[in-house]
């Protein structure tokens, strides 16, 4: 489970079926070492290169990478007058990154004098992920953010009967007895259906793409039928990553005007 979401031990509603108690404030922080080399580039320059990064887990938030200030290219950054305050960490100072003719305003922050309860943040800085051009985990370029080591994606073959219908209609968009079931930490199960079991004649590429750091880049389709157009109602991962690799070529459905019927497992 993720530490800070769903029923994780550092979430706002930790699990009840446990034999322990977690003492401490309602908003909890946990920092631990990140085990691999991390780099960030901007404007053709390597702004950050470190093997000493840490991950900060914070109640209700995704993990945030922090890196030693000494591992950031000092010649590419300058302090600004911008400051923010966090009641759990203290007052943050900010830096702008300049590389060639590219500028990322207030892209880096740090807590020069963190609160006593988070004193271990001193000497570390965080980056706004999208402010940099590229991020690398060892030599692999990252799609989306750095992965949460406590987040899982599992894909399993299933023989459940799955049918996708246009709501308030008998129009069937897809039907299969051979779906894949994708379970992801903190999210509801999703069924992915073979493309051969989907009414391709009702689908039109929408041009929308989204990036998930756990599954890869998704492509979307809109459904047009019975005079109705359901935008971005179908998606697929053409080149899924890691534990999601099995869903390549499969499609999933979600839209307020669609009903996904799932039958009981066969006896």
Name each model-derived stretch.
Residues 1-267:
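Terminal leader/tail segments of proteins
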């Amino acid at each position: 489970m993720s530490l800070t979401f769903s029923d994780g031990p550092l979430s706002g509603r930790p699990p009840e079926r446990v034999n322990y108690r977690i003492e401490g404030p309602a908003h909890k922080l946990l920092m631990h070492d990140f085990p691999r080399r991390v780099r960030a580039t901007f404007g053709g320059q390597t702004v950050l290169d470190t093997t000493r990064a840490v991950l900060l887990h914070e109640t209700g938030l995704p993990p945030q990478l922090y890196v030693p200030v000494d591992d950031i290219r000092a010649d590419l950054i300058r302090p600004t007058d911008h400051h923010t305050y966090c009641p759990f960490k203290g007052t943050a100072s900010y830096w702008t990154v300049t590389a060639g003719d590219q500028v990322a305003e207030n892209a880096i922050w740090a807590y020069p004098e963190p609160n006593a309860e988070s004193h271990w943040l001193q000497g570390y800085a965080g980056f706004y992920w999208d402010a940099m051009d590229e991020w690398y985990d060892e030599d692999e370029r990252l799609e989306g953010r750095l992965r949460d080591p406590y987040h899982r994606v599992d894909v399993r073959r299933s023989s459940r009967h799955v049918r996708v219908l246009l709501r308030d209609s008998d129009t069937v968009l897809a039907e299969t007895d051979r779906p894949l079931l994708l379970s992801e930490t903190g999210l509801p199960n999703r069924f992915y259906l073979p493309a051969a079991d989907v009414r391709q004649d009702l689908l039109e590429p929408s041009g929308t793409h989204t990036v998930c750091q756990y599954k890869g880049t998704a492509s979307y389709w809109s459904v047009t039928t019975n005079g109705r157009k359901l935008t971005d109602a179908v998606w697929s991962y053409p080149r899924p990553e890691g534990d999601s690799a099995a869903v390549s070529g499969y499609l999933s459905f979600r839209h307020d005007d669609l009903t996904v019927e799932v039958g009981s497992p066969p006896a």
